[in-house]
Amino acid sequence: MNTFKVQFFSPDDQISFSGVVSLSVTGLEGELMILAHHAPYLIYLLPGMITVKMSNQTEKKVVIDSGVLEVANNNCSIITSQIQVFDRAIHDEKSFKNKRISIYLSYLDEKFLS
């Protein structure tokens, strides 16, 4: 199976996933799915949820603030100011939605009220 590596970077954290089958993100151009051996690409990401599908059939959900995604050499790097990984064992759905909403609201405040 074709897989690739995804790395998230923020000032406070760094998270890596190996064995990724697909990555779903939302950028300025709309929804985008990254697969293994994707052509080199650079895109501005909107705040929101990123879905990481692993080769073992599991999914990871990551909430980010706005950021930049770069794809090169079968690696994907995401640079953002905030990273929050959702884990059902740790978070309940309500607290996760509240965290996601707070990220969206801070983005809207920054963009439209500044």
UniProtKB/Swiss-Prot annotation:
Gene Ontology, cellular component aspect: plasma membrane; proton-transporting ATP synthase complex
Ion transport keyword on record: yes
InterPro entries, A to Z: ATP_synth_F1_dsu/esu, ATP_synth_F1_dsu/esu_N, ATPsynth_dsu/esu_N
Ranges that cross the membrane: none
UniProt entry tagged with the keyword Transport: yes
Major localization listed first in the record, in broad terms: membrane
Localization in the cell: Cell membrane
GO molecular function, one term: ATP binding
Domain of life: Bacteria
Coiled-coil segments: none
Role according to the record: Produces ATP from ADP in the presence of a proton gradient across the membrane.
Quaternary structure note: F-type ATPases have 2 components, CF(1) - the catalytic core - and CF(0) - the membrane proton channel. CF(1) has five subunits: alpha(3), beta(3), gamma(1), delta(1), epsilon(1). CF(0) has three main subunits: a, b and c.
HAMAP family per record: ATP_synth_epsil_bac (MF_00530)
Family of the protein in this entry: Belongs to the ATPase epsilon chain family.
Name of the protein: ATP synthase epsilon chain
Lineage: Bacteria, Pseudomonadati, Pseudomonadota, Alphaproteobacteria, Rickettsiales
Gene: atpC
